């Protein structure tokens, strides 16, 4: 997606071999117009898939997931990383390792929001080792829901996340694919959408 690639070139910062900082428009401060454009793009790509729910993990995946859900006319669910006092019903849970934060979290979704009748589009801000998306897939599997696709805002193609997900038979669509983050420079591959 050209607008996203340009924004990464202009405002993204490489912090190390595997870390890209995009806090001025995605992960801390959010650019609503860019989020809407990304959500709309995901909705266009998956328009014929019969999506009934869009799922993400809190926090940075929420904005593009919400815009995609709005465009598709379906609910959006975000998996929580910490159990809330208000989440006292039966939960779907999975363990997820975060490459950026270097911690493992338990993610959860209330079972009442996801069923075997659902066709799911998973959206996340980054794809590195694939563990976040894999955790969301596990939640869907626990509910019997079918994952129709995975939409990724920024893919670190030099890591093995895409391969992990494709080996699971999943359709992965990334708006920006990064070949490398070496020497402080972002090098891109051709994006999927």
From Swiss-Prot:
SUPFAM superfamilies, A to Z: PRTase-like (SSF53271)
HAMAP family membership: XPRTase
Binding-site list for 5-phospho-alpha-D-ribose 1-diphosphate: 128-132
Gene encoding the protein: xpt
GO biological process: purine ribonucleoside salvage; xanthine metabolic process; XMP salvage
Functional pH dependence: Optimum pH is 7.4-8.8.
Task of the protein: Converts the preformed base xanthine, a product of nucleic acid breakdown, to xanthosine 5'-monophosphate (XMP), so it can be reused for RNA or DNA synthesis.
Source organism (scientific name): Enterococcus faecalis (strain ATCC 700802 / V583)
UniProt similarity note: Belongs to the purine/pyrimidine phosphoribosyltransferase family. Xpt subfamily.
The protein's name in its UniProt record: Xanthine phosphoribosyltransferase
Principal EC category: transferase
Subcellular location: Cytoplasm
Temperature dependence (free text): Thermostable for 60 minutes up to 55 degrees Celsius.
This protein's record includes keyword Cytoplasm: yes
One example GO MF annotation: xanthine phosphoribosyltransferase activity
InterPro entries: PRibTrfase_dom, PRTase-like, Pur/Pyrimidine_PRTase, Xanthine_PRibTrfase
Amino-acid positions noted as binding xanthine in the UniProt annotation, renumbered to this chain: 20, 27, 156
GO-annotated cellular components: cytoplasm
Record-linked Gene3D superfamilies: 3.40.50.2020
């Amino acid at each position: 997606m050209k607008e996203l690639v340009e924004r990464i070139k202009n405002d993204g910062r490489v912090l190390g071999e595997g870390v890209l900082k995009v806090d001025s428009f995605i992960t801390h401060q959010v650019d609503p117009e860019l989020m809407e454009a990304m959500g709309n793009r995901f909705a266009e790509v998956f328009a014929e898939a019969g999506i009934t729910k869009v799922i993400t993990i809190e926090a940075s995946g929420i904005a593009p997931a919400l815009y995609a859900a709005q465009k598709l006319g379906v609910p959006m669910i975000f998996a929580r990383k910490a159990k809330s006092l208000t989440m006292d019903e039966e939960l779907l849970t999975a363990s997820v390792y975060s490459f950026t934060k270097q911690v493992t979290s338990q993610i959860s979704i209330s079972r009442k929001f996801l069923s075997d009748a659902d066709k799911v589009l998973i959206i996340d801000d980054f794809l590195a080792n694939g563990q976040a998306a894999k955790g969301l897939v596990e939640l869907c599997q626990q509910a019997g829901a079918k994952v129709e696709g995975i939409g990724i805002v920024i893919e670190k193609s030099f890591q093995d996340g895409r391969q992990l997900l494709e080996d699971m038979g999943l359709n992965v669509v990334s708006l920006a694919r990064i070949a490398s983050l070496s020497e402080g420079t972002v090098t891109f591959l051709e994006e999927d959408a």
